[in-house]
Structure formats: C-alpha cells, structure tokens
Amino acid sequence: MTPADLAELLKTTATAVLSEHALDTSALPQTVVVERPRNPEHGDYASNVALQLAKKVGANPRELAGWIVEALTKADGIASAEVAGPGFINLRLETSAQAKIVNAIIDAGSGFGHSELMAAHKVNLEFVSANPTGPIHIGGTRWAAVGDALGRLLSTQGADVVREYYFNDHGAQIDRFANSLIAAAKGEPTPDDGYAGSYINDIAARVLQKAPDALSLPDAQMHETFREIGVDLMFSHIKESLHEFGTDFDVYTHEDSMHSTGRVDQAVARLRETGNIYEKDGATWLRSSSFGDDKDRVVIKSDDKPAYIAGDLAYYLDKRERGFDLCIYMLGADHHGYIARLKAAAAAFGEDPGTVEVLIGQMVNLVRDGQPVRMSKRTGTVITLDDLVEAIGVDAARYSLIRSSVDTPIDIDLALWSSASNENPVYYVQYAHARLSALARNAAELGLIPDTDHLELLSHEKEGVLLRTLGDFPRMLKAAASLREPHRVCRYLEDLAGDYHRFYDSCRVLPQGDEEPTQLHTARLALCQATRQAIANGLGILGVTAPERM
C-alpha cells in the first residue's frame, strides 16, 4: 500500500463516517494528506484529516478522529489505527500491505513513479540560452544541469516538454565579440569593451583558416565575416560541451530571426490592437505598469530601433502560437526584474500571465580546501562548464548543481565532489546502486531469483523503513514536478541510499556457507531489486549514470 493508496482509503473512510453521522461530506479536501511521522514510534503514517474536517462540519476533532479510526481498523492492510493529541490519526500497516510497493516497482520498471499529473500541458522549457560570445560559464552550467533534470522530471508526469535554447545573436554584444576576434587576428590588444581569453585567439585563428583573406576585406565585410564565422564556431563549441554534459535541446531559436522575419513588428501590431502601446518622446512604449511591472517599457526607441524587450515580446508570442500553454524561463540571478516584465507582457497580449513561469538561479562558487578556485586561464574571467567537468566529472558536476534549490547560492567543494567517500552525495547514491547490482550478480551465481510471493516475511524494522521510503517515490516526483524542484530527487535518493545501506548492514540477503536459501532470502532479493530500480529511475531523471560496478 503506497501513501497514495492510504490517502485514498482515508478519504473513502472519512466520507463514509461523515455520511453515517449526517455531516457534510463536501467538506472533505480533494486530497487527503498522509505523512510519515518524525518519531517512528508513532506509527508508519499519520494524518490530520480529522482536524481539517472538524471545524467545517461542527464536530469534536478527537471524536471525529475516533470514528474514522474505528472504521479504519476493519480495513484490509491496516494493522492498527489510533487517535493522538488533539485529533491526529496514527496508522500502522500490515507487512503484506506495506510490501506491495515491491510488486508495483518491479512491474512498472523504468516507469515507476510516472503519472499523468501534467498530461494536459505542453511545456516550453527555455534554459541556458547563453550568448555565443564565450564558453558556458558556471552559472549557465547550473541551468544546463537543473533545466535538463526539470525537463526529464516534467516528462515523467506526462507533460509534453520541449527544451529550447534562445540563441542571442542580435545586438551589441555580438559586435563586440567580432571586434575582439579581429583584434586578436591582427595581433592587437583586446578592445576595452571586448572579450578576453585564449579562446578568442583560438577562434580568430580558425576564422582565418576558413576565410584566409578576411583581414584584407573592407571593414564592414571583414566585421561581418568574423561575426558570422566566429559566432558559428563558438556556438558549435557550446553545443558540443552541453552534449558531453548530457544536455541536449529540441529547438534552437535565433533572436535575430525575431527581427528578420518580422515577428517583432507583428508583436507590436498585436499590442496596438489591444491598446497597450502608446507613443511618447518619439519612442513606442508598452503599458507594462498596468499589468504589474514597476514601470512602462520602451519597445521601439526614438531612433526607430527595437529595444531588447521587443525580441522578448515577439519570442513569447511565438511560443504561444506554437501551442505552448506553459512557458518556463530559467534565468540568472541578475534577471529578477524579468519576472514582472514577462508576466506583464503576457497580460498585455491578452494572454494569461500564468502561462509564464520564471525561475531565478543563484550564484555558484567553486572552492578547494575552503579557498575560492581561481579563474580559468582559457577564458580569462570565468569558470566554465568544461572546467567543472574536468575537475570532478560529469556525474558529480550535474548532481552537485541540481542538489540545492535554485534560489540558493552554492559552493562546490572540488575535493569533496571528486572523492570516493560516503561524504560525497553522488558517490553515496551511486555506490548503493553498484552494491545492489553486485548483490544481484551474486544471487544469480547462486541460482537465486527474487520472489514476490512471500513479501509478508519482510517484518524487520529496517525493512519497514526501506519499504516506506520506496513508497514515497511517486508522490515525491509529483511534488518535485509541481514545485519545479528537481533537487528533491537528489535528497530523496540520499535518504533511500541511506535506508538501503542500513538495511543491508542489519538484514542478511544471501545465504552464507552451507546455509540453505529460504523464502526470506528471496523476498529480500525482491526488495533489493525494487530498491535498485527506484535508485536507477531517480538517477535517470537527474541525468546521472547508475553504475553496475564501482
């Protein structure tokens, strides 16, 4: 019996109790919450449903809880139920009911934990979207890990997810990039507002390999040559780095296309139709303050050139016209103002601001022995995705970046995350999977097969804890997806790995020496098979490997 099954049983029982005592059944919440009590002595699960209902139906909470408990004790799978405190209900499950989660996991396999929670949603998930003027920095690397994990997570809950990279190839930063390449190709100092680092010299040299006469072209043509080839080379490197990191995108949208295809003009025309555009001081303004922004925004400047927000407006409209009912933007710590801005833009178009969600990521710092890690010589000013992967590997890099809530700054200790120790969270989880895999191989050599026919034998305290943690997996995924918090998967896996290690240390799974195999051995093998599957499923959502050997 999973927590979801138990919640449904509680709801059904409470409905019957309310009806029996002529109380209002409509007062029942849509979802009844069951939780694991902090003190295991209080039972396997607890619920406050009687406390929730009592005031609404005019009943004494302890009395109402008592009626529910009396009915629950007659239900299949309930070993005991009791009233605690002002009206809490504490429950213990029969071992056979609790162990049904093992069957559920083995039957579902890689689909265990999946649901149709978000099946009605077509989601555009835009993340990283770094300018093609340099390698992916550590902040963008955090989004590469978290965004990819979030996409996988939403997909497990039935969402139709499209991962999108918005290619910022329009604007002054691209011109500065081209000027930096030209200076490097000529052997001149980097312009004051240019980009520095050995990667600039590398790309400049490669531009000259592709266009040997580039420096002899007229200035405008030379600039365009370095701009076009340089951006293409830089973005190819970015995509290669992301791919090796395990992050790929379904769609790459060029910012420049919003302007060249007339999408910006179409967006402005639509806003004129809604009456949310006006002219002032020779510029065209969006009435964004009418929709929650702190001020109105210039869309077309007085020199008739589009402001940066013009591309954002066109891009949002483009997403909606492609059928996305949820547009998630994952932005850096310096983009807090974009939350109100993007929602105001949606409202100004006459769209639901709820179609826009903005996640803001905080800073990432690398440390070793408590000291900040110095900047990359290759890039001159930033630590890159490639630097982090070189230091600790892809799995540790992804896990370390996903493990904390995105609104929390994080310090990544390179010594810790590269260590083969239980203090390293990703090692701890992966080792549990490798240990389970070794156990399965050893069992096969002994001719033992996991057996789910005698799961009622799993009555040891540590087995019960492990079973309850396994039962939490589906609702953990639902919560993580609903809250857009893939870090919950990491924390769950660490709890599950810990519960497994403690179970393994207390409960012998395989017979030793001349000991004859028993039904308990094969039941425990089934429990281990289910645990291994749950860990593999969780690591898969994170884009982290589940090793067979370590």
From Swiss-Prot:
<dbReference type="GO" id="GO:0005737">
    <property type="term" value="C:cytoplasm"/>
</dbReference>
<keyword id="KW-0067">ATP-binding</keyword>
<keyword id="KW-0648">Protein biosynthesis</keyword>
<dbReference type="InterPro" id="IPR035684">
    <property type="entry name" value="ArgRS_core"/>
</dbReference>
<comment type="similarity">
    <text>Belongs to the class-I aminoacyl-tRNA synthetase family.</text>
</comment>
<dbReference type="InterPro" id="IPR005148">
    <property type="entry name" value="Arg-tRNA-synth_N"/>
</dbReference>
<dbReference type="InterPro" id="IPR001412">
    <property type="entry name" value="aa-tRNA-synth_I_CS"/>
</dbReference>
<comment type="subunit">
    <text>Monomer.</text>
</comment>
<dbReference type="InterPro" id="IPR036695">
    <property type="entry name" value="Arg-tRNA-synth_N_sf"/>
</dbReference>
<feature type="short sequence motif" description="'HIGH' region">
    <location>
        <begin position="130"/>
        <end position="140"/>
    </location>
</feature>
<dbReference type="InterPro" id="IPR014729">
    <property type="entry name" value="Rossmann-like_a/b/a_fold"/>
</dbReference>
<dbReference type="InterPro" id="IPR009080">
    <property type="entry name" value="tRNAsynth_Ia_anticodon-bd"/>
</dbReference>
<protein>
    <recommendedName>
        <fullName>Arginine--tRNA ligase</fullName>
        <ecNumber>6.1.1.19</ecNumber>
    </recommendedName>
</protein>
<keyword id="KW-0436">Ligase</keyword>
<dbReference type="GO" id="GO:0006420">
    <property type="term" value="P:arginyl-tRNA aminoacylation"/>
</dbReference>
<dbReference type="Pfam" id="PF00750">
    <property type="entry name" value="tRNA-synt_1d"/>
</dbReference>
<dbReference type="Pfam" id="PF05746">
    <property type="entry name" value="DALR_1"/>
</dbReference>
<keyword id="KW-0547">Nucleotide-binding</keyword>
<keyword id="KW-0963">Cytoplasm</keyword>
<dbReference type="InterPro" id="IPR008909">
    <property type="entry name" value="DALR_anticod-bd"/>
</dbReference>
<dbReference type="InterPro" id="IPR001278">
    <property type="entry name" value="Arg-tRNA-ligase"/>
</dbReference>
<dbReference type="GO" id="GO:0005524">
    <property type="term" value="F:ATP binding"/>
</dbReference>
<dbReference type="GO" id="GO:0004814">
    <property type="term" value="F:arginine-tRNA ligase activity"/>
</dbReference>
<dbReference type="Pfam" id="PF03485">
    <property type="entry name" value="Arg_tRNA_synt_N"/>
</dbReference>
<keyword id="KW-0030">Aminoacyl-tRNA synthetase</keyword>
